[in-house]
């Protein structure tokens, strides 16, 4: 068996009435884990670099062995992508690194 998991969007945190939400204007809104497991995987490997969700079809091909001539397989453990990760911020595609980081929310100490 093989299983691939990733969320459709990240979450942001604020001190608003809706404290956990999607925010297309901060990096946390697009930061999601990618988890791959399979019956023939015998070790844990962690990758800390950003991988665009646009590689999903290639990752799926790499994992399953299914091939098409239109999309090359993409191994997220070894294949590098020199293009910046682009995200849609609700208005246009922008580089993910151009978004502001998630602000630190400190607890109210009243």
What are these regions (language model features)?
Residues 1-110:
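Catalytic domains that recognize anionic headgroups
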């Amino acid at each position: 068996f093989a299983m691939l998991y990733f969320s459709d969007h990240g979450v942001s945190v604020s001190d608003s009435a809706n404290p956990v939400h999607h925010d297309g204007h901060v990096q946390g809104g697009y930061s999601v884990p990618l988890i791959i497991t399979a019956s023939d995987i015998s070790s844990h490997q962690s990758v800390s670099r950003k991988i665009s969700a646009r590689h999903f079809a290639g990752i799926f091909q790499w994992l399953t062995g299914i091939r098409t001539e239109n999309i090359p397989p993409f191994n997220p453990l070894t294949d590098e992508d020199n293009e910046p990760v682009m995200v849609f911020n609700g208005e246009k595609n922008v580089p993910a690194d151009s978004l502001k980081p998630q602000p630190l929310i400190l607890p109210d100490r009243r």
